[in-house]
């Protein structure tokens, strides 16, 4: 974000930023500065017309809360979170709740070791086919 003086502000809270943007079908966030963001909860909540989203350029190293981030994005088909750094995330509940059209989801760098709340992450993601390429047993 740019403030009145023309310099970039250090945003920490992006919660509800695009929530209920029902007419939004696509969005280019490739140049969004997210390096200081801590909270992304409900960010795309109820964006029911959103079809595809690429957040691979998001810097999420400080994010702790992503609960309900894509809640009820019922038209979302493709989502790229391939570089999403989730090592500090503690709240992940309902992350993809009711993303019933989602068929392509890249979570290749997700780390859930610090997550404390993770219920219903994929609730009603009926179109999503899970393919586990590698299962690691750390017993």
Predicted regions and their residues:
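Negatively charged
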Residues: 1-139
């Amino acid at each position: 974000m740019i403030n009145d003086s023309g310099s970039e502000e250090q945003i920490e809270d992006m919660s509800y930023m695009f929530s209920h943007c029902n007419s939004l079908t696509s969005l280019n966030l490739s140049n969004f500065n997210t390096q200081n963001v801590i909270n992304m909860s409900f960010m795309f909540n109820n964006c029911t017309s959103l079809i595809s989203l690429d957040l691979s350029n998001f810097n999420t190293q400080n994010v702790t809360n992503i609960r309900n981030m894509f809640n009820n994005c019922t038209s979302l088909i493709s989502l790229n979170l391939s570089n999403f750094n989730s090592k500090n995330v503690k709240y992940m509940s309902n992350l993809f709740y009711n993303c019933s059209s989602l068929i392509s989801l890249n979570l290749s760098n997700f780390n859930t070791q610090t997550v404390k709340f993770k219920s219903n992450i994929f609730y009603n993601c009926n179109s999503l086919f899970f393919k586990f390429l590698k299962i690691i047993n750390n017993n």
